[in-house]
Design a protein with these regions (language model features):
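Alpha-helical transmembrane segments and their immediate juxtamembrane cytosolic regions
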Residues: 1-256
Length: 256
């Protein structure tokens, strides 16, 4: 069996590789951004887009534990965060400089810097020091994410920490991910409520709560990298600023 296959594990169980999750997350993000620019009447696009960030947050944590150099990983994220800011500002603010909202790569970078600090302390094998550091990192990361107005604000940084603390496939890790993401997305973020009719009964579903569905593909990931190459890696990073810039240019052409 080729190691480049995006699905079907060696054990015969269906699984998704890291490459497949990246592609899925990019497709979901594109849907959300199509709604934000060209197709604002198609609410189903932004509903699907709710699944993108949890997948990116999960893969960022996995990337931390699989990278050979955190320094290079962080610098690459910082580079594309800078390159993505103008396209992001144009898309969400309609201007080259929109200081009240920063792009999602800054969110990922803040979360990973916090994880790196916690892991550095954890390796000193002093439990009390690690627990104290973890508490301070979670609090400061959440506050800093909110004050700096990164995408998803402090709750976005907190989502990354959730996948760090509940990393693994033990039942309590999966339960922790589910309960913590419910708290973050439904209780903290909340948002629009959609009426749904099933068997004559009406229910209201929180739009942001659809982010919990991201756990389905995440739980199908079993540590397999799948297809990997330098061009593919950089294409995944470049997709973020490039697709936003293209959408902005199309929108400006259609509305001029």
């Amino acid at each position: 069996m080729s190691t480049n296959n995006l699905s079907s594990s060696a054990s015969g169980r269906f699984s998704l590789s890291a490459a497949a999750l990246h592609i899925l997350a990019m497709a979901l993000m594109l849907m959300d951004h199509l709604w934000a620019t060209l197709l604002p009447a198609q609410d189903w696009l932004t509903c699907a887009g709710r699944l993108a960030f949890p997948i990116f947050a999960f893969m960022a944590v996995e990337g931390y534990f699989h990278t050979h150099s955190f320094r290079k990983y962080a610098l690459l994220l910082a580079l594309f965060a800078v390159l993505s800011e103008v396209p992001f500002d144009l898309m969400y603010g309609g201007t080259w400089f929109y200081p009240v909202h920063q792009n999602v790569i800054w969110t990922l970078l803040l979360g990973l810097l916090g994880i790196h600090l916690m892991e550095t302390v954890r390796k000193k094998q002093k439990t009390w020091l690690y627990l104290l550091t973890a508490l301070l990192v979670v609090l400061s990361g959440t506050v800093l994410g909110t004050l700096s107005m990164v995408d998803y604000y402090g709750t976005g940084v907190l989502t990354i920490f959730i996948f760090y603390f509940f990393r693994g496939r033990k039942w309590w890790c999966l339960a922790g991910q589910l309960l913590a993401l419910y708290w973050v997305n439904v209780q903290l973020l909340g948002g629009l409520l959609y009426p749904v009719h099933i068997f004559g009964m009406e229910f209201e579903i929180c739009q942001q709560g659809l982010a919990l569905l991201a756990l389905l593909p995440i739980w199908l990931y079993r540590g397999r990298q799948g297809y990997h190459s330098k061009p593919f890696q950089y294409a995944c990073y470049a997709f973020y600023p490039v697709h936003m810039l293209i959408l902005v240019l199309i929108l400006q052409y259609l509305t001029r």
